[in-house]
Amino acid sequence: MRKYEIMYIIRPGVEEEAQKALVERFAGVLTNNGAEIINTKEWGKRRLAYEINDLREGFYMILNVKSNAEAINEFDRLAKINEDILRHIVVKEEEK
């Protein structure tokens, strides 16, 4: 299993309860597919570097996970489908 850093931006209009449910759902997608979540950071609402779908802000989440490729691929697939996630990126961390 490799280490990955996942960052995703949630649409700012999402209610707080729905936002928590979304974060739990995507954490569940990872853990149900064999990933281990090492660290979760909520950066909160921040201004975007450029407009995405006429939005200027987004709620940032960062996850550090130890995972196999299947869990990452499933997260990526579902994040692309979900309209509440504006952008996401998965970065493989270098092994030391």
Curated annotation (Swiss-Prot):
InterPro entries in the record: Ribosomal_bS6, Ribosomal_bS6_CS, Ribosomal_bS6_sf, Ribosomal_S6_plastid/chlpt, Transl_elong_EF1B/ribsomal_bS6
Keywords: Ribonucleoprotein, Ribosomal protein, RNA-binding, rRNA-binding
MF terms in GO: small ribosomal subunit rRNA binding; structural constituent of ribosome
PROSITE patterns: RIBOSOMAL_S6
GO biological process, one term: translation
Gene Ontology terms: cellular component: cytoplasm; ribonucleoprotein complex; ribosome
Pfam family membership, one: Ribosomal_S6
NCBIfam families documented for this protein: S6
Family assignment from sequence similarity: Belongs to the bacterial ribosomal protein bS6 family.
PANTHER family: MITOCHONDRIAL 28S RIBOSOMAL PROTEIN S6 (PTHR21011), SMALL RIBOSOMAL SUBUNIT PROTEIN BS6M (PTHR21011:SF1)
Protein role: Binds together with bS18 to 16S ribosomal RNA.
UniProt-recorded name of the protein: Small ribosomal subunit protein bS6
Naturally occurring in which organism (per UniProt): Bacillus cereus (strain ATCC 14579 / DSM 31 / CCUG 7414 / JCM 2152 / NBRC 15305 / NCIMB 9373 / NCTC 2599 / NRRL B-3711)
Gene: rpsF
